[in-house]
A protein has these predicted regions:
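Integrase module of LTR retroelements
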Residues: 1-152
């Protein structure tokens, strides 16, 4: 499951064993609402899990408008398609033919996605989401100026 914020290009993704309405509801609650607040709208494919009474009520109760992309024209949800492609390509590069480990590599691929500037904006999704650049592990080990200013 992948969710993308259209403005910041921030992506949340999780390896779900099932994609039932209750699983999607749990994903939206854990990965979006509790971290970033209630979304104004949600654009999804017209899968049954997004169109179920359970998920519709969940969205209605939170004031989220549930919208659908056109099933025959996937480009109508182009941001999600581009993000899916970036995540799949990142997983392919990290796994190099090894199958079955993609769920363990997903957080690493997301980290790379969040901290890489997007061409369309010239900024990272991380900086647009949190208002500053991420401190990367190399900065800590080399004690960069940004890190040394905050050493207690």
């Amino acid at each position: 499951m992948v969710a993308v914020d259209y403005f910041t290009k921030w992506a949340e993704a999780d390896a779900l064993a099932n994609i039932r309405d209750v699983d999607i509801k749990k994903f939206v609650w854990r990965n979006i609402v509790t971290r970033f607040g209630v979304a104004k709208s949600l654009v999804s494919n017209i899968g049954l899990q997004f169109d179920s009474n359970t998920f519709q009520k969940f969205c209605f109760d939170l004031g989220i408008k549930n919208k659908y992309s056109t099933p025959v024209y996937l480009q109508s949800n182009g941001q999600a398609e581009a993000t899916n492609k970036a995540i799949v390509n990142g997983l392919r590069k990290r796994l190099e033919g090894t199958k079955g480990m993609w769920a363990e590599e997903l957080p690493n691929v997301l980290w790379a996605y969040w901290t890489t500037p997007r061409r369309s904006m010239g900024e990272t999704p991380f900086s647009l989401t949190y208002g500053g650049e991420v401190v990367i592990p190399t900065e800590v080990s080399l004690c960069s100026e940004r890190v040394s200013r905050f050493v207690l």
